[in-house]
Amino acid sequence: EGLILLTNDGDLAHQLMHPRHKVSKGYFVKVRGIVENKALSDLRKGPVIDDRRHQRVRVKILHTVNDKTWLELFLREGTNRQIKKMFQKIGYPVQKIKRFQIGPIMLGDLQSGESRALSPKEIEQILN
């Protein structure tokens, strides 16, 4: 759920997706349970998933309600099901993930099913 970028521009796609460029992606994540500081510390160090240490993660708790915790998470890589695996490993099953940012591009006020074109300035920010 959340921000998806569609493009037919190969250079733009490469700049956004290739791990070498380390484009940050922001997510809101809801997990079951009250997340402890030790668990966040483990994520920030770079979680080990499938025998591979991943890059450090920026993460903070936004709020906790009824045994559910909402977090803000930033990754610079994005392997298959990485977020779910990270939280499963530290004991907090993921209930919802919503991407709100890819590099300089923000979801903003767009609602589900809505779209908009990138501005020339946004394209320039990605390519430079």
Question: Model-found features: residue ranges?
Answer:
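Basic, flexible Lys/Arg- and Gly-enriched helix-loop patches that mediate nucleic-acid binding at interfaces
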Residues: 1-128
